[in-house]
Amino acid sequence: MDVYLSSGRVRLGDADLVGEGGEARVFRHQGRAVKVFHPVSPQDAVGRAVRAKKLEKLSRFPTGLPPTVLGPQELARSARGDVLGFVMRLVQGDDAGRLAQRRFRDGRVSNDAVTGVFARLSQTLAVLHGRGVVVGDLNDGNVLVSGDEGPFLIDADSMQFDGLPCAVGHERFLDPRLYGVDLSTVPRFDPGTDWFAFAVMLFSSWLYVHPFGGTHAKLGTLLRRAEARHSVLRDDVVLPRVAASWKTLPDEALHWFRGVFEADVRSPAPDVLWRTAFTTCRCGLEHARPACPACHALGPLATRPAVRVKGRCTARVLRQTTGRMVTAAMQGGVRFVIEEDGVLRREDGSLVLERRLDAGERLAIAGASTWLSDARGGLVRLENGRVVERAQTGLAPHGPILAAATQAVYRTEHEWLIDQVTGARVGQVLEGQTWLWTGERLGLGFYRAGGVTVAFLFKTGRAGLKQLPGVGWSGRLVSAHAAFDARHALLTVTTETSGRDVVHRWLLSETGEVLAAGHDGRAGHGALLQGRVVIGTDAGLVSLGVSSGVLVEGTCFTDTQPFVSAQDELLPQSDGSLVVVGARDVLQLSLS
């Protein structure tokens, strides 16, 4: 694709792609980002009207905004002079949604660091509001966190200013006062709606739960609880096990949150929040109270029993840590890596690294070996703390491309998928854009370019990729996960479309046939056992059945609710039990 900037013609290719959403693609070019809108069909009258409003916004975009607002620096045009998009500063980092993921945060990003991020974001919002600019669609996918810089606001071209509306708002961050309101006609957002979204993000990042998350006996969904102003600060809302209790927060923070979520107070975040100081108790709990609320309630010598029973569910603690679980796999038994006291060790206590993981580093388990990938794509195979092999893999926007099983390790080299064990080329993929997973017998991956998804299946130890034409989606890719048994694969993809998170799932046979698919499902990791599907949710384990090619929700095993959440990884065992890998523990669940 050719675009024209002030410097002349620029060619953008798939290898330069940084990200893709429902509205545009973003490319890397000479240290800057070029956002190119998707083409609109001449027959699409609504789409052409929306694009016209977008171009008007670009022409009237305010100048002199804070450098943390990644607005247009110049326009990108076609050879005829038509506006195709714009150029903005390129920033490398993670979206703010990662701050609400406990497996990502624990041991790496403290609550004090989170407080600093949001203190700086509050300053940016105050400046914007003073200039008459409202973010509108403020959500954790539009905020980029990059070290001590920022945070940065992206998608600035959708902001509300100069009488031009912000046409969309993400439902998880949208002020309930705007539910059911047409956002596209006139300006509907105001500074108060930004502060509501800000409060949702801060609360979720401190406590790992949405303020209207959890489960409630009568108000069954997050949106219904938001409409009723019934937050997790109420005692009748059951928190997911991944969440930290709101009782870890200071009174000043709780007072503001209650006002925002339950009384429609829309005041800016008070400065007292940024003086919140967290401490970590010897029990591992991070809190901002004079005394640890967990130890105060249970007593300093209280311990959690190794076996817990609720109804039909028995939960056995296989491993607990005051550090964090880094990664886990089911490979002839449960294998995992723990980071504790600044050291990484395997499940048998053997050394992996005598230091913490750096930002951008990832681990993958391959039998007795542990593969470490770094932010530049460098790979090392570690055994007992020693490097026994080195390699290199490609980098995608989500990180280094690497997948491993007991006897299989896969990486990429330019446009090729490589079997690291044999050195053979398995098949062609898209350089820098491929997602990849492998089980013991089957592997799965996909790449996207130009709004088109190419998914593929392969068998470990063999060459050749089987394309999966029945797998595809639209919208911005938020996350993806795959699970396997000996003859099946389950792909779960979450996208953001028109302000909603949509969960898609495909159950695949070993030949690549789509046995069933489901769309708009519950969030949560999936697991497979002989073709049977179960997902972990904040309400407990939920089985999925197949009906006429559709994945349909079956039984919700509510007795499992205290032991599993949507953020936990599920690893099935051959005896029918399920291993749940949390942020700081590994549990074995059995149903009688």
Residue ranges and their predicted role:
Residues G141-D182:
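Activation segment/activation loop of eukaryotic-type protein kinase catalytic domains
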Residues M1-D16, A49:
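Juxta-kinase regulatory segment immediately upstream of eukaryotic protein kinase catalytic domains
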